Regions:
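Conserved alpha/beta enzyme-core scaffold
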Residues: 1-173
Length: 173
């Protein structure tokens, strides 16, 4: 199977309303801006977006937020995106703030087929609210569910027809 597409629009063409997107990047590094623009132009809406953060007010996921295409954002950081902040504070967008390490582990677990795991991170805080908490070896842990996505948008330096990717510099996040 050839996984090379001629452009970002072709690569994103199957993304549909209500899809869950896992979006790479950290701050301004490694953000798949061309793919985000392609999703914006595609017009898919009611998206659940899982990403470390929402970028800034001028780049990254702001293009989907400006168009009101994002229904839910799962992120570890509100950051410097004023649009995201306003939508979050007004209740216009559903937001699940997740500790950064827990976010990474939830994505990893979901990809490995692990439906849930226990972590001490967040016990006794708002993060644990409404979640199962158990004690193991005298220590309390909160249960977190694995995250799976239908599509992943990443920025790579180079790729081959089998889907192997090479990342470079600070984009190796």
């Amino acid at each position: 199977m050839n996984k090379v597409f001629p452009n970002a629009a072709a690569a994103c063409h199957d993304i549909h309303d209500g899809a869950t997107l896992l979006v790479g990047g950290f701050g301004l590094c490694g953000v798949p801006n061309e793919c985000i623009a392609a999703v914006r132009d595609l017009g898919a809406k009611n998206l659940t977006v899982v990403s470390n953060n929402a970028g800034t007010s001028t780049s990254g996921l702001v293009h989907l937020l400006n168009n009101r295409q994002v229904k839910k954002m799962m992120s570890s950081y509100v950051g410097e995106n004023v649009v995201f902040e306003k939508q979050m504070l007004s209740g216009e967008i559903e937001v699940e703030l997740i500790p950064q390490g827990t976010l990474s582990e939830r994505i990893r677990a979901g990809g490995a087929g692990i439906p849930a795991f226990f972590t001490p991170t967040g016990v006794g805080t708002l993060v644990a609210e409404g979640k199962e908490v158990r004690e193991f070896g005298g220590r309390r842990y909160v249960m977190e569910r694995g995250i799976t996505g239908e599509f992943a948008l990443v920025r790579a330096f180079r790729g081959d027809r089998f889907g192997n990717l090479v990342f470079r510099k600070t984009s190796r996040n």
